[in-house]
């Protein structure tokens, strides 16, 4: 499934701002927050906490629920309906998307977070939306790893990212308990990719530090790593696994970023994540980079993310000048 947001050059920025303000007023009201907080208790009749039951009913996943849980459904419809209208998404599109359990986990965590802390910048969900796990050899048994995956799923974590190559059974178990299994690394053993796909991996993040193979390989200290990364991207795309590519932005490769963007577009990459090294770029270089990210998100086919919350400030400033709103990583 390709993840995207609506790019509509005819969107009225003032209308969006009004919708955002309406959403903040609704969610920020003491009544809505009290109702959401009260809904986090487990319903003995329905078998889950009331918020999850009401959301599942709204999404059409449950039909027979008790009266107390049913009373929450209008609150859910109001909160969700106002939020999706900001990005031009229909209720049917949302309901279709949320049939996958990991999307529902994320929605539950977001609504719980709204009840606990309201709208904060950066926003704090009730549970981490994603957990990254670097499994070290022989630290834990298979059973212990499976048990920890179960705990994360029960806590409400929607995505789990395994760092490096792991046993495919862990990917399968994460998929079985309703999480979104991901892998991240510099490249992958091409012979293992089919196993990972069969186990249920949904998303991979692959590092690419340069358009020049020699520069990339020397930076990471491994021969043929650039070639492996590109082949991994191609093979995962063939298997319909969502591909994100990451680059650590420094003075050494800043001028290459536009070229890397063009290469990744040719390879059919869905997301491009730029990790900006603290203190390495000048303020003006960072500003120009964030402007590039903004314009690529508005005009390009590939979405670009960053670990730097300053993109939110840049996007807000540009939007005030009549341009479109984009989702940013922390803002």
Q: What is the meaning of each model-derived region?
A:
Residues 1-127:
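Flexible, acidic/Gly-rich N-terminal and inter-domain linker regions that tether
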Residues 34-41, 53, 57, 147, ...:
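Charged/polar, solvent-exposed surface patches and flexible loops
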Residues 70-79, 181, 279-288:
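Short N-terminal helix-initiation segments at or just after the protein's N-terminus
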Residues 116-144, 150, 158-163:
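N-terminal pre-triad scaffold of radical SAM enzymes
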Residues 131-137, 272-275, 323-331:
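Short, intrinsically disordered, charge-balanced linker/junction segments flanking boundaries
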Residues 142-163, 167-282:
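Radical SAM/AdoMet-radical enzyme domain recognition
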Residues 280-331:
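A C-terminal junction/extension of Radical SAM enzymes
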């Amino acid at each position: 499934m390709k993840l995207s947001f609506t790019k509509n050059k005819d969107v009225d920025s003032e209308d969006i701002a009004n919708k955002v303000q309406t959403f903040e007023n609704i969610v920020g009201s003491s009544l809505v927050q009290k109702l959401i907080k009260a809904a986090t208790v487990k319903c003995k009749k329905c078998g889950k906490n009331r918020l999850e039951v009401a959301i599942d009913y709204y999404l059409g996943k449950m039909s027979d629920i008790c009266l107390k849980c049913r009373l929450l459904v209008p609150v859910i419809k109001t909160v969700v309906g106002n939020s999706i209208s900001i990005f031009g998404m229909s209720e049917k599109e949302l309901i279709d998307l949320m049939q996958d359990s990991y999307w529902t986990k994320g929605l539950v965590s977001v609504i719980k977070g709204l009840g606990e802390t309201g709208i904060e910048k950066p926003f704090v969900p009730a549970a981490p939306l994603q957990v990254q796990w670097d499994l070290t050899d022989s630290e834990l048994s298979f059973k212990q790893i499976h048990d920890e995956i179960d705990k994360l799923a029960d806590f409400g974590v929607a995505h789990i990212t395994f760092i490096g190559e792991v046993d495919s059974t862990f990917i399968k178990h994460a998929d079985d308990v309703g999480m979104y299994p991901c892998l991240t690394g510099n490249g992958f053993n091409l012979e293992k990719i089919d196993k990972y796909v069969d186990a249920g991996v949904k998303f991979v993040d692959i590092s690419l530090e340069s358009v020049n193979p020699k520069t990339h390989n020397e930076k990471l200290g491994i021969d043929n790593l650039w070639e492996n990364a590109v082949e991994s991207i191609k093979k995962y795309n063939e298997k319909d696994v969502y591909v994100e590519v990451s680059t650590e932005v420094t003075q050494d490769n800043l001028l290459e970023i536009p070229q890397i963007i063009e290469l990744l577009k040719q390879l059919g990459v869905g997301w491009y994540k730029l990790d900006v090294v603290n203190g390495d770029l000048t303020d003006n270089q960072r500003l120009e980079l964030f402007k590039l990210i903004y314009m690529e998100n508005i005009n390009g086919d590939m979405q670009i993310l960053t670990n730097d919350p300053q993109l939110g400030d840049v996007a807000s400033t540009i939007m005030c000048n009549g341009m479109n709103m984009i989702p940013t990583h922390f803002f």
